[in-house]
């Protein structure tokens, strides 16, 4: 979603897991897109992509935070590396944090049928 290619549930490819997740349903998707739009607006002010802004924000949180971006091609890798050049002011960090804290995520992360598999006990070694 931060990459800008996904703006509605119709943008998911056939068989994409997200098309089954309640968080990405036609009802919940627009509500969850509000945070993406806020991040995008801040990124435009910084002349960077929303993905770069998010990575820069994570890297600014301290040495104990290590972002692991999903990188599917060379263009995304180069974009992610560009995040290292972005410096955020304390005010910008706070603006991003506030946007995240104020966001009301709608819909469960996984379909209800998957819930039992998500919270299973690990077998003893």
List each language-model region with its residue ranges.
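Helix N-cap / loop-to-helix initiation motif
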Residues: 48-49, 73, 89-90
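Hydrophobic, secondary-structure "cap" segments at the distal end of domains
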Residues: 56-57
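Terminal-tail/helix-coil boundary detector
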Residues: 14-45, 60, 64, 78-125
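Hydrophobic faces of well-ordered beta-strands that scaffold small-molecule active sites
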Residues: 67-70
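Glycine/threonine-rich phosphate-binding loop and adjacent beta-strand/alpha-helix elements that clamp
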Residues: 53
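Short, flexible micro-motifs
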Residues: 7, 73, 110
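Aromatic-lined glycan-binding groove of carbohydrate-active enzymes
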Residues: 1-15, 49
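Phosphate- and divalent-cation-binding pockets in alpha/beta enzyme and binding domains
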Residues: 1, 76-79
């Amino acid at each position: 979603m931060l990459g800008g290619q996904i703006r509605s549930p119709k943008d998911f490819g056939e068989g994409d897991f997200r098309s089954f997740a309640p968080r990405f349903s036609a009802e919940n998707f627009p509500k969850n897109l509000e945070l993406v739009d806020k991040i995008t607006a801040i990124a435009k002010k910084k002349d960077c992509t929303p993905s770069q802004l998010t990575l820069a924000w994570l890297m600014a949180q301290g040495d104990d935070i290590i972002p692991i971006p999903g990188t599917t091609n060379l263009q995304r890798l180069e974009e992610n590396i560009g995040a290292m050049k972005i410096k955020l002011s304390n005010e910008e960090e706070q603006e991003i944090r506030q946007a995240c804290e104020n966001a009301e995520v709608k819909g469960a992360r996984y379909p209800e049928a998957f819930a039992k598999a998500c919270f299973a006990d690990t077998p003893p070694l």
